[in-house]
Amino acid sequence: MGKALVVFGSTTGNTETVAEVVAKVLEESGMAVDLKNATKVKAAGLAEGYDLVVFGCSTWGDDEIELQEDFIPLYDDLGAAGLGGRKVAVFGCGDSSYTHFCGAVDAIAEKAASLGAKVIDLPLKIDGAPDTAEARDWAKEVLRSAA
């Protein structure tokens, strides 16, 4: 069925929870899945060997889009990840009371697309605490779109 990588940056644990749910759904579909915290990865060659790459990142800041701090080094070096031609999906948690609700999701998707990734146009933007049912449903949609 293929191999997937799920990389997340999480401060409060919400994005990590969603990443774990997404990884489980992908595994249940028969994919081999690697789940990694953004603090534990380097961008260079990150996507090599994967059919699907899923990024999860929370958004901080009111006046401008701020990616979760652990994710910033990966984002800055994303050009070295080898995303060209790979299927990529993006999710994140945020607070809809902020001007740029889940802006990190859009920023990551746009950067991945500019690097030649085949971004699955189904971003998941979660307001506040994660809804695991919503995360499961999204992961299933990503699987269908990636097929």
From Swiss-Prot:
What the protein does? Low-potential electron donor to a number of redox enzymes.
Q: What is this protein called?
A: Flavodoxin
Q: InterPro entries from the entry? A: Flav_short, Flavdoxin-like, Flavodoxin, Flavodoxin/NO_synth, Flavodoxin_CS, Flavoprotein-like_sf
Upper lineage is: Bacteria, Pseudomonadati, Thermodesulfobacteriota, Desulfovibrionia, Desulfovibrionales
Which UniProt keywords are present, listed alphabetically?
A: Electron transport, Flavoprotein, FMN, Transport
Entry's PROSITE patterns? FLAVODOXIN (PS00201), FLAVODOXIN_LIKE (PS50902)
Cofactor dependency: FMN
Q: Name one GO molecular function term.
A: FMN binding
Record family assignment: Belongs to the flavodoxin family.
Which parts of the sequence belong to the Flavodoxin-like domain? 4-143
A Pfam family of the record is Flavodoxin_1
> Is Protein biosynthesis one of the keywords?
no
